[in-house]
Amino acid sequence: MQLELLNEQGQAASKYDAPETVFGRDYNEDLVHQIVVAFQANARQGTRAQKDREQVKHSTKKPFKQKGTGRARAGMTSSPLWRGGGRIFPNMPDENFSQKINKKMYRAGMAAIFSQLAREGRLAVVDSLTVDSPKTKPLAARFKAMNLESVLVIAEEVDENLYLASRNLVNILVVEPRYADPVSLVHYKKVLVTKGAVDKLKEMFA
């Protein structure tokens, strides 16, 4: 699979031969959907919580007598039928949202995403991405010169300078291959991969 090799101005300078096992696979929409949903589900913290009828703070006194009022009988105001009462099936903080994805399925799904991005022209290769100092302004100017506004950069190695220079950039994320995830791949408009990262992606997803 031939990918565009971009220069410093963001223009296609030449072609780069990328491995077909990662960048030339057929697109499997169902598989991609499954790994994206599973990744988002596994990222949930499970911190939401609601109270049932035992946890809400209400008096246990019977609100009115059992018979003779014409109203439906009621035992206490903490009943889920009453306003301010507890929930019947409350959300609990220990709820488990995790979904299991087999390693082969995950690798195949990631390769399908990379391949589809390449076919759509949303994926390109650059020689490298390095900065001399942890300054955001020069790096932002470089991306602006390449006409990139929403981009995921997969670099072979993200050193401290590159991390500090890129972390404040809006709509720009710089990660190492091991931290590339399906949600980020489908979210950003453009994906840049360094030559060294291509080899690592081949080891991970081929």
From Swiss-Prot:
- Gene Ontology molecular-function annotations: rRNA binding; structural constituent of ribosome
Q: Name one cellular component (GO) term.
A: ribonucleoprotein complex
> Segment Disordered: which positions?
44-77
Which portions of the chain have biased composition (kind: Basic residues)?
58-70
An individual GO BP term: translation
Out of the domains of life, which is the source? Bacteria
**Oligomeric state and partners?**
Part of the 50S ribosomal subunit.
So what family is this one in? Answer: Belongs to the universal ribosomal protein uL4 family.
Q: Which NCBIfam families match?
A: rplD_bact
Official protein name in the record: Large ribosomal subunit protein uL4
Protein source organism: Variovorax paradoxus (strain S110)
